[in-house]
């Protein structure tokens, strides 16, 4: 079972990548 932080990281990863590219 993944930790809550790991799940949130994977869930928001695409959004964070977009923010870093901006």
Curated annotation (Swiss-Prot):
Its EC number is 1.1.99.36. Its cofactor is NADH. One of its GO terms (molecular function) is oxidoreductase activity. GO terms for cellular component: cytoplasm. It is an enzyme of class 1 (oxidoreductase). Optimum pH is 7.0. It is found in: Cytoplasm. Keywords: Cytoplasm, NAD, Oxidoreductase. The keyword Electron transport does not apply. It comes from the Bacteria. It catalyses: N,N-dimethyl-4-nitrosoaniline + a primary alcohol = 4-(hydroxylamino)-N,N-dimethylaniline + an aldehyde; ethanol + A = acetaldehyde + AH2. Homotetramer. Belongs to the zinc-containing alcohol dehydrogenase family. This is a novel enzyme, catalytically different from common alcohol dehydrogenases. It is effective in oxidizing ethanol, other primary alcohols and benzylalcohol only in the presence of p-nitroso-N,N-dimethylaniline (NDMA) as an electron acceptor. NADH acts as a cofactor here instead of as a coenzyme. This is NDMA-dependent alcohol dehydrogenase. The lineage of its organism: Bacteria, Bacillati, Actinomycetota, Actinomycetes, Mycobacteriales.
């Amino acid at each position: 079972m993944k930790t809550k932080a790991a799940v949130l990281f994977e869930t928001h990863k695409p959004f964070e990548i977009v923010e870093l590219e901006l």
